[in-house]
Amino acid sequence: MAFDKDVFLTALDSMTVLELNDLVKAIEEKFGVSAAAMAAPAAASGPGAAVVEEKTEFNVLLTEAGANKVSVIKAVREITGLGLKEAKDLVDGAPKNVKEGIAKADAEAAVKKLLDAGAKAELK
């Protein structure tokens, strides 16, 4: 069977965010690689100078759906833009990241929305 790049790209285009996430994880496991971007080494500013970088990207982790699962699914849909089935699967699969690599203010707002819906969520 010959590899057809166009068919592959079309298949990728039709996948949901959750399916793409599962694909990335499978590729990472299969080939022993990481999808994380490589950071350039920081230039040394002198001996003993400690550089403390403030974290700029945060992940919103749903740890538990809680008693009011319907409200949590609605909150997840608002935060992520996922469809009903994808949001339900994400909530059922807790603990899972709801959003990854977002700004601190957006992450805090998402955690607050999940907590208000009755879920247990963390900012990572």
UniProtKB/Swiss-Prot annotation:
CDD domains: Ribosomal_L7_L12. It comes from the Bacteria. InterPro entries: Ribosomal_bL12, Ribosomal_bL12_C, Ribosomal_bL12_C/ClpS-like, Ribosomal_bL12_oligo, Ribosomal_bL12_oligo_N_sf. Pfam families: Ribosomal_L12, Ribosomal_L12_N. Keywords: Ribonucleoprotein, Ribosomal protein. GO terms for molecular function: mRNA binding; structural constituent of ribosome. One of its GO terms (biological process) is translation. GO terms for cellular component: cytosolic large ribosomal subunit. Disulfide bonds: none annotated. Belongs to the bacterial ribosomal protein bL12 family. Homodimer. Part of the ribosomal stalk of the 50S ribosomal subunit. Forms a multimeric L10(L12)X complex, where L10 forms an elongated spine to which 2 to 4 L12 dimers bind in a sequential fashion. Binds GTP-bound translation factors. Forms part of the ribosomal stalk which helps the ribosome interact with GTP-bound translation factors. Is thus essential for accurate translation. This is Large ribosomal subunit protein bL12. It comes from Verminephrobacter eiseniae (strain EF01-2). The gene is rplL.
